[in-house]
Amino acid sequence: MPSQMEHAMETMMFTFHKFAGDKGYLTKEDLRVLMEKEFPGFLENQKDPLAVDKIMKDLDQCRDGKVGFQSFFSLIAGLTIACNDYFVVHMKQKGK
């Protein structure tokens, strides 16, 4: 039986390939749909209507309109770090 961490890794890989399809990368539209489905609260809370465009620009380092798994994982890592920072602050406030 896989551990929770192994399951999390599998979920990230599966999610990327579900939205990337056979081409093996995400286009801006793929990324937008992925963000809407997998992180609906994130996009809803963005004040900037160009949030997906800016994320795509940050992730598409080759400027070819494609986001590979490594760049996708960087996005997930960044979001996780931001959520952890919020969680730590919230837990400290709760402990007071």
From Swiss-Prot:
Region (Ancestral calcium site): 60-71
Crosslink (Glycyl lysine isopeptide (Lys-Gly) (interchain with G-Cter in SUMO2)) position: 37
Pfam families named in the record: S_100
One term under GO cellular component: cytoplasm
Keyword Signal listed: no
Claim: Acetylation is one of the keywords in the record: yes
PTM-bearing positions, type N6-acetyllysine: 23, 28, 37, 54, 57
Quaternary structure (record): Heterotetramer containing 2 light chains of S100A10/p11 and 2 heavy chains of ANXA2/p36. Interacts with SCN10A. Interacts with TASOR.
Other known facts: Does not appear to bind calcium. Contains 2 ancestral calcium site related to EF-hand domains that have lost their ability to bind calcium.
Stated name of the protein: Protein S100-A10
